[in-house]
């Protein structure tokens, strides 16, 4: 996905090339997080290229193109925390992009975690990333048995 931007500046022409050079050094070829004014809750990740500049009627315009990943990501990770005493079914609702959550457990004993029936783990206190616990778009149910606190954190992405 390509995003194109045009930035206008009103500086004297003898300062414009210096300004253009500063912008080019700051952006050109760099992979950056890009937050659009029209979509402030998300960011895009892309490599930016400062393509050219024009000067019309003492208004300088600098053109920037960014080749971005197809998904826009929420600014903050989604976090679901649950205190478990017995058996709890926890629903993790995810956007379009598949994600593997970071799991943090605080428990005196282990917690039994079941995802999609055939993925079962017994985990004690600590932080984990389980590749088989991949969240799909929509509601994802995880069954947790034991006593303790479990937290799921992941980066959501949408088109």
What positions do the PLM features span?
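Short, low-complexity, polar/charged sequence segments that are solvent-exposed and flexible
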Residues: 22-26, 53-55, 83-87, 122
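Short N-terminal edge-element motif at the start of the domain
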Residues: 10-42
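Solvent-exposed loop and beta-edge segments used for protein-protein assembly and interaction
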Residues: 26-28, 56-60, 95-97, 136
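Short, surface-exposed beta-strand/loop "edge" segments at domain boundaries and coil↔beta transitions
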Residues: 11-14, 40-45, 110-114, 149-152
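Intrinsically disordered, low-complexity segments enriched in serine, threonine, and glycine
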Residues: 71-159
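Short acidic, glycine-rich loop/turn motifs
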Residues: 7, 36-40, 115-117, 146
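Short beta-strand and beta-hairpin "edge-sheet" elements
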Residues: 29-72
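Oligomerization/assembly interface segments of phage tail-like spikes and tubes
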Residues: 1-13, 58-71, 140
